[in-house]
Amino acid sequence: MKRFTAQIRHSYDTIVRMCRVQDDTFCFGRKVLMALLGLALTVFGAWNLSSVAGLVFALVGCWLLVSLNFPAKNRAQSIREALHGEYPTNRYEFYDKHFVLLAQNQDVVDYGKIMRLVEDDGYCYLFVSAQAAYMLEKASLGTELSRFMAFMEKATGLSWTKPYKLTTFNLKTILELVRGGSKDKKK
């Protein structure tokens, strides 16, 4: 029995957003290390600006800090080139045991294959691996959004999480990273 339908009209912005969420979800440790190294190099360089080495350290540190999202942007650019500027509209139908991506190549996915449920303010991401996710627009679910999210938690045994952010980084985030991710499977 069909339970829900959802869709997304992709654009370059949605591709960039998905790549960033992927990075923030699965590569956040690398991002934190890059930020800490960048900060350390910038501070060290600022104390020694009178020397060439200090200037180089400061420049490299600043470059690391401003390029935290470079891997995601680079991946998004590669996807844009592969799509030749033709962004798809993906429609989904959710059933009791699986969902179907209605596209040129129809894809049937059992809920057991989903490894992580992630949400941000506008989209839901159903990750089947660290490199692949199905993205859908929350607005396309309308008033059914909360029921859909509860259904997905029950169907997958997972909890919805938000992507990690440097601005909300805390001890809880560190503990989740050490354990290898956030609340992947409900207990």
What are these regions (language model features)?
Residues 1-41:
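N-terminal membrane-targeting/pre-transmembrane regions
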Residues 24-84:
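Alpha-helical transmembrane spans
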Residues 68-108:
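Conserved beta-hairpin
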Residues 125-187:
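A membrane-cytosol interface segment of integral membrane proteins
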Residues 93-94, 118-119, 128:
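Generic beta-strand structural signal
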Residues 10-12, 96, 121:
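Residue-level signal for tight coil/turn positions that link beta-strands
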Residues 99-100, 107-124:
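Phosphoinositide-dependent membrane-docking surfaces
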